[in-house]
């Protein structure tokens, strides 16, 4: 791949084809953004089967016109399909939001609750680029914190 997209638009705007192209050429274990994957059921099936993680940034996707409104965002569809995903807030220079505000937005829009967020965070840990012992330590801390929060 030469760094350009089929129609010269950023990968997350170039529909599901750009995700397929990335998978074919780079064989990643995780993909930044990748929300256009939701436009292709076969792609969602592949991501789930291959356990490829999507880093999802809802507010950024609205701000960059990947989706028109937060109600149009495919985060809930991706989650319900069983694809590994995490919720992120993108770079502060792009989207000056916090992870807490992203969670509040998904809670309000899709009726997500702490079980959704715990699941996404555990998936993020599973796909983190660090030693298994550190993943386990963070996983236990996260579960303890969610349990204590009721």
Segments predicted by a language model, with ranges:
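Short acidic/histidine-rich active-site segments
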Residues: 1-13, 83-98
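Glycine-enriched alpha-helix->loop->beta-strand junction motifs that scaffold or abut catalytic
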Residues: 23-30, 48-55, 81-84
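Catalytic beta/alpha-barrel core
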Residues: 29-38, 63
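Conserved, mostly hydrophobic/aromatic
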Residues: 31, 54, 90, 131
């Amino acid at each position: 791949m030469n760094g350009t997209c089929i129609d010269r638009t950023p990968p997350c705007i170039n529909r599901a084809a750009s995700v397929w192209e990335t998978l074919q050429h780079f064989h990643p274990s995780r993909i930044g953004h990748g929300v256009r994957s939701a436009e292709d059921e076969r792609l969602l099936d592949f991501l789930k089967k291959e356990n490829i993680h999507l880093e999802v940034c809802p507010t950024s996707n609205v701000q960059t016109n990947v989706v028109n409104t937060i109600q149009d965002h495919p985060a809930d569809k991706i989650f319900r399909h069983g694809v590994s995903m995490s919720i992120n807030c993108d770079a502060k220079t792009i989207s000056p939001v916090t992870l807490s505000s992203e969670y509040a937005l998904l809670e309000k829009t899709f009726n997500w609750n702490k079980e959704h967020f715990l699941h996404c965070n555990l998936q993020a840990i599973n796909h983190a680029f660090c030693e298994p012992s550190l993943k386990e330590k963070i996983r236990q801390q996260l579960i303890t914190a969610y349990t204590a929060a009721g």
